[in-house]
């Protein structure tokens, strides 16, 4: 899994914001460890030099991997970690020009000949200095842990933290798959802002983007909502307030904390405490109560800059070694009957978006795909291709090994049910049916076709339907030529 989501976001920030971020050594370390191996190598190669000729940088890669070389450099350029400079390199002057040329011309040509432009690359000084310091300084402390502080409560175990983060993030996913569940105000706003849900009456319903979101790994899911939160924060606090950069740096710092250890809330600024309570709702931070003196990072926040997280449709801890559960749980038969070998309420809730559920046993849920269940999914913006991909992606190993995780007859029927809804296209239009003469009708019809305003016409009744944007031009055409 790549970290393209966060890299795309960082690359979209302006130079000033990135410079502010690179002032924090923990941010620099987090970004360095998030980069692909090749990009990391390039940074380490340049760590102890001021500049390096771009032409020689080609030697860092073989001809066979030149494309990966270019992509790695581009990523570093986009993140403003590496800069490209042009310097004038002196060369040997060429042979003396003809004596017939004026001395000023000869002098000008000599100056041009004695200089040659060379491209060099260099590391961002802030980024470079912070990485250097991090390599020589050991035992750096981000926040004090709870070694000398007791809050009179048994600290959560790692299993407790895993269970908590899984439960919290599943709640977020439940808000998408079950419109009867009411999310918190923050989560509701983020789901709307990110176009994962849409307002329908008094509640929220999932969109096509929301269904695609459910198919992604948890790392991408979390960053998707965090990025929306960052942007919303910048809008509320005002551009240039620095709140977005503060939260980004805070997130990167939290990713270096130790799993299972508690840290003092009192060491945080008021702004960071506000962020902390927001991160609780994502399952990234555990606090026993809002007034607890300690907070505990969960596996999700620690893995935030490495991407080493499993899909939360699987369990974070106990289920990750059970390959059958990781590979899939759905068996779909040619009679449209679907068997889901799962005890997860979340998985069943996801299936109910496009399956009519019939009954549920302790480790098995049975449903059937019907025209109405598919139409309900289509109304919510879920496409037939997304449904087919979802079944394939989560098919049971036995079904996947058969080479046909979803029967062709079922896949084709789902596409046909979608095509039923696409037989009619809706276009805002204007109808003309009172032409003074036949010549006026014919001329206007020709004009509408030439200008791409034409939709439909009926010659016997001299009726013409055109696009809405063509209304004023056609009225002007008739007035000018037939008034």
UniProtKB/Swiss-Prot annotation:
Q: GO cellular-component terms in the record?
A: transcription factor TFIIH core complex; transcription factor TFIIH holo complex
Name the UniProt key words of this record, in alphabetical order.
Answer: DNA damage, DNA repair, Nucleus, Transcription, Transcription regulation
The entry's localization annotation reads:
Nucleus
Which GO BP terms, alphabetically? Answer: nucleotide-excision repair; transcription by RNA polymerase II
| Region of interest: Disordered | 93-117
Q: Which domain of life is it from?
A: Eukaryota
Could you list the residue ranges forming a coiled coil in this record?
none
Q: What is its main location?
A: nucleus
Q: Which Gene3D superfamilies match?
A: 3.30.70.2610
Q: Where is the composition biased (Low complexity)?
A: 94-116
Query: Keyword Methyltransferase: yes or no?
Result: no
Query: What molecular functions are annotated in GO for this chain?
Result: ATPase activator activity; double-stranded DNA binding
| Its job | Component of the general transcription and DNA repair factor IIH (TFIIH) core complex, which is involved in general and transcription-coupled nucleotide excision repair (NER) of damaged DNA and, when complexed to CAK, in RNA transcription by RNA polymerase II. In NER, TFIIH acts by opening DNA around the lesion to allow the excision of the damaged oligonucleotide and its replacement by a new DNA fragment. In transcription, TFIIH has an essential role in transcription initiation.
Per UniProt, subunit arrangement is: Component of the 7-subunit TFIIH core complex composed of XPB/repB, XPD/repD, gtf2h1, gtf2h2, gtf2h3, gtf2h4 and gtf2h5, which is active in NER. The core complex associates with the 3-subunit CDK-activating kinase (CAK) module composed of cycH/cyclin H, cdk7 and mnat1 to form the 10-subunit holoenzyme (holo-TFIIH) active in transcription.
UniProt record similarity statement? Belongs to the TFB2 family.
Matches recorded under PANTHER family: GENERAL TRANSCRIPTION FACTOR IIH SUBUNIT 4 (PTHR13152:SF0), TFIIH, POLYPEPTIDE 4 (PTHR13152)
What name does UniProt use for this protein? General transcription factor IIH subunit 4
Task: Identify the gene encoding this protein.
Answer: gtf2h4
């Amino acid at each position: 899994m790549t970290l393209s989501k966060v890299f795309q976001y960082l690359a979209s920030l302006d130079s000033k914001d990135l410079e502010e971020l690179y002032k924090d050594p923990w941010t620099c370390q987090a970004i360095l460890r998030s980069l692909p191996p090749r990009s990391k190598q390039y940074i380490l190669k340049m760590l102890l030099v001021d500049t390096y000729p771009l032409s020689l940088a080609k030697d860092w890669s073989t001809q066979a991997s030149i494309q990966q070389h270019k992509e790695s450099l581009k990523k570093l350029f986009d993140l403003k970690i590496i800069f490209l400079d042009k310097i004038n390199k002196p060369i040997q002057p060429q042979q003396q020009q003809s004596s017939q040329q004026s001395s000023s011309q000869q002098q000008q040509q000599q100056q041009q000949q004695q200089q040659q432009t060379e491209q060099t690359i260099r590391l961002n000084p802030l980024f470079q200095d912070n990485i250097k310091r991090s390599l020589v300084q050991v035992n750096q402390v981000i926040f004090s842990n709870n070694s000398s502080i007791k809050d009179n409560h048994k600290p959560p175990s790692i299993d407790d933290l895993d269970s908590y983060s899984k439960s919290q993030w599943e709640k977020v996913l439940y808000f998408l798959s079950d419109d009867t569940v009411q999310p918190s105000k923050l989560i509701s706003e983020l789901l709307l802002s990110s176009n994962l849900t849409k307002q329908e009456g008094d509640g929220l319903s999932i969109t096509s983007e929301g269904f695609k979101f459910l198919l992604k790994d948890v790392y991408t899911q979390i960053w998707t909502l965090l990025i929306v939160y960052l942007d919303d924060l910048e809008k509320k606090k005002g551009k240039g307030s620095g709140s977005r950069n503060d939260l980004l740096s805070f997130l990167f710092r939290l990713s270096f904390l130790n799993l299972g250890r508690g840290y003092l809330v009192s060491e945080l600024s008021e702004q960071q405490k506000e962020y902390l309570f927001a991160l609780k709702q994502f399952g990234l931070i555990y606090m026993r109560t809002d007034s607890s003196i300690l907070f505990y990072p969960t596996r999700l926040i620690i893995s935030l800059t490495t991407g080493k997280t499993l899909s939360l449709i699987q369990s974070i801890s106990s289920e990750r070694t059970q390959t059958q559960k990781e590979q899939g749980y759905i068996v779909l038969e040619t009679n449209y009957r679907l068997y889901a070998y799962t005890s997860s309420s979340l998985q069943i809730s996801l299936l109910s978006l496009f399956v009519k559920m019939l009954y549920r046993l302790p480790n098995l849920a049975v449903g059937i795909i019907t025209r109405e269940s598919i139409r309900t999914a289509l109304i919510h913006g879920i496409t037939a291709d997304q449904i087919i991909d979802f079944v394939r992606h989560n098919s049971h190993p036995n079904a996947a090994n058969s080479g046909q995780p979803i029967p062709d007859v079922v896949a084709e029927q789902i596409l046909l049910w979608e095509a039923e809804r696409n037989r009619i296209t809706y276009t805002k239009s204007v109808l003309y049916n009172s032409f003074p003469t036949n010549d006026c009708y014919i001329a206007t019809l020709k004009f509408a076709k030439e200008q791409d305003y034409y939709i439909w016409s009926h010659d016997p009744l001299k009726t013409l339907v055109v696009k809405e944007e063509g209304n004023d031009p056609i009225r002007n055409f008739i007035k000018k030529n037939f008034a």
